[in-house]
Amino acid sequence: MYKSFSMELAGRTLSVDVGRVAAQANGAAFMHYGDTVVLSTATASDKPREGIDFFPLSVEYEEKLYAVGKVPGGFNKREGKASENAILTSRVIDRPMRPLFPKDYRNDVTLNNLVMSVDPDCSPELTAMLGSAISVAISDIPFDGPCATTQVGLVDGELVFNPTAAQKAVSDLALTVASTRDKVIMIEAGANEVPEDKMLEAIFAAHEVNQEVIQFIDKIVAEFGKEKHGYISCEIPEEMFAAIKEVVTPEQMEEAVFTDVKQVREENIREIKNKLAEVFEESNPEWLHLIDEAVYKYQKKTVRKMILKDHKRPDGREIHQIRRLAAEVDMLPRVHGSGMFTRGQTQILTVTTLAPLSEAQKLDGLDEAEKSKRYMHHYNFPSYSVGETKPSRGPGRREIGHGALAERALIPVLPSEAEFPYAIRTVSETMESNGSTSQASVCASTLSLMAAGVPIKKQVAGISCGLVTGDTDDDYLVLTDIQGLEDFFGDMDFKVAGTHDGITAIQMDIKIHGLTRAIIEEAIRRTKEAREYIINEVMTPAIAEPRTEVGKYAPKIIQIQIDPQKIGDVVGQRGKTINAIIEQTGVKIDINDEGAVSVCGTDKDMMDKAINMIRTIVTEFEEGQVFEGKVISIKEFGAFLEFAPGKEGMVHISKISKERINHVEDVLTLGDVVKVVCLGKDKMGRISFSIKDYKEEN
C-alpha cells in the first residue's frame, strides 16, 4: 500500500510517495519537486554501538549523472567518490537533523539521498533535505521533529523563495534555512554583501514558509508514521557522578578548566582522569571505561555554569571580548602572496597562487550551468595544529566544508575575469587550532589575496559567536569569538563573514532544538561589531589596499580582444596554430567564446611576441601594412614567408631586391627573417608582398 501526497511550493508541485519504494528501510520518501526526483531513506541499526560517546549519524547525498542525461567520464564510466557539492550537501542535511535525535541514542542511523532526476528549476539539494526530514519523521527512529527547509534568493531587492535557475543566476543571496515549528535550527548562506537587516528579514521569512511544509509533513505522519521504538539510554549512572565529585570537587574542576592556555587545561584534565582511574580501579572497576565521558560531562556542566551564571569565560575574557589578534603578510618569499592571521591559539597561514584561466577547476556534476570555477580555496587541518599524532589521509568532509565556507565568503569581493584574468587558488594551512579556524581562514585569505596583488573590492573578515542556554528561552548568553572549549560545551557555532557593508557568508551549527529570533538577532549584531573591529584594528594596519601589481614570481597576463569569428584561425586545425605559438614563445594562451585572448607568461618579450603573432593571424592583409616574416620555402619564382603560425605569404622574385637577381637564393636562404610591405591584391586577386619596397619609415 502506498499513497502520494502533494502541495504547492513556490509555484511548483512537491509530491511525496510513501510506501512505494524501499520498503525495507525504516522510512522512505520518494520525492518529486517539479521534474526533480530524489529517493530519501532513513535506516537504523537494531542495537546501539558499544564503546562510543556520540550519536553515530551518517548522511549521504548521491549524485547520479544519469539524472541529467550524462555518462560519467574516466575509464570506468561510473560514478566514483562523492563530489565536493555532494559532500557539502550531506553536511547541510546533517546539521538540522542531528540536534533533533536523542542525545543518548547510540544506534547507527544512515540518511541516504539518491538523486535520480534533476530539474534545473527545482533544487535537488532542497528536495533531499525535505526528503530526509520526511523519511525520519515517518520512520520508527526516535526523532523530535518534524523540520523543514526553504531556500531564499534576493532578486532586485525582493526575496524569492526556492528560486529557479534563472533567479539564482542573478540573485544577491543564496540562503538556506531549516526550522522546527517554533525555532530556526540551521542557517547557511552565501551573499553579495547583504545588509544585516535584510538577512534577518530573509531568515524569518523562510521560517514562516517552513511552517507550511511542516503542516504538510504532519499530514503524512498522521497517516503513515510509525510508532517510535524504544532504545537503551547510554547515560552515565548518577552514583558515578556522585563518586566523582567526592574525588574532584566542583571548585577543583573549575580551577582545572580556568586558563587561557589550552595545553595547560588538557594536562589538568588528564591528571583528573588519572586520579579517578586510580580510585575506581579498586572501588568500581566497572566504571573505568566511562571515565572519559563522565569527565567530559563534568567539564561541560562546569563550563556552562561558569559562563551562564557567573559570566566568567574559561580563559578569563569578558563575554564579548575577542582574543589577542595579529595579522601579517609576505612570510613566504617565493610564493605569489601570503598572509597569516592569529586569533588567540588559532593561527592560519594562507598562500595565494595565480595561474592562467585554463587552470580553473573543471566541474562535472549535476549543475550543467556551472562548468568550472575560477576561484578555489582549500583548507588543511594537520594533526600537529592540535598537538596530536595522526597520519595525513587527505582532506575529509570537515576540511572540504571549511574550505567551501571561506571560498563562499570571498567570492563576492573578487574582481571579474575581465578585470583580472587569472585563476586564483588560496590554500589555508592551519598552524594552530583552538576554535573558529574557518573564520580565521577568511581573514588570512583576504590578507594573502591583497598581498598577491588581487584587486579585491573590500576586505572580508569572519568571526564566530557561541551560545549557552538555560532552562527557558529567555535564559541565555551569546558569546563573541568562541574558543574550542566553548564550542564543544556550548549550544551554537554561529559563523558570519563579511565586509563593512554587509554579509558574504553564514554557517550556523547548533546542538539544541533551535534558536529564537532574539538569539539570532543578537548573534548577527555581535558578529558585525567584531568583524568591523578586526578589519579596522588588525587587518588594515597589516595591509590597507591590494598591491597594485602581482608579485615578481607570479605569471603576468596580457589580454587582447579578437573577432570571435577569427578564433578558429588562431587555434588552427586540431590546435596546430596555437600550439606552434606556445612552442615558440613558452607562454600559455586562453581564448574564450567572446574572443578574449589571455597570454600568460613570465618573460615579457616572449609574451609580446605571442601577442604580435596572434594579431598578425587575425589581421586582414591591407596595402601598405608592414610585416616581419621567416623564409620557410624557396621556389624559382619567389619565396614563401611565415608571418605567424598558419599565416603565410609569397614574395615574387621581382620584389625581393632592387637589383636584378636570377635566383632567389642569391639574396635569401631558408630561415631568414625579413620585413615586407603589403602591396595589396594583384590582377589575379592574390595578396602580394615586397621586400625591396619596404622602407624603414614604414
From Swiss-Prot:
Q: Origin, by domain of life? A: Bacteria
- Residues noted as binding Mg(2+) in the record, renumbered to the chain: D487, D493
Quote the subcellular location field of this record: Cytoplasm
Q: Which reaction does it catalyse?
A: RNA(n+1) + phosphate = RNA(n) + a ribonucleoside 5'-diphosphate
Q: Name one GO biological process term.
A: mRNA catabolic process
Recorded GO MF terms: 3'-5'-RNA exonuclease activity; magnesium ion binding; polyribonucleotide nucleotidyltransferase activity; RNA binding
Q: Which residues form the S1 motif domain?
A: 624-692
Q: Top-level EC class, please?
A: transferase
The enzyme's E.C. designation? 2.7.7.8
Q: Which InterPro entries match?
A: ExoRNase_PH_dom1, ExoRNase_PH_dom2, ExoRNase_PH_dom2_sf, KH_dom, KH_dom_type_1, KH_dom_type_1_sf, NA-bd_OB-fold, PNPase
- Write down what this protein is called: Polyribonucleotide nucleotidyltransferase
What is the protein's species of origin?
Answer: Lachnoclostridium phytofermentans (strain ATCC 700394 / DSM 18823 / ISDg) (Clostridium phytofermentans)
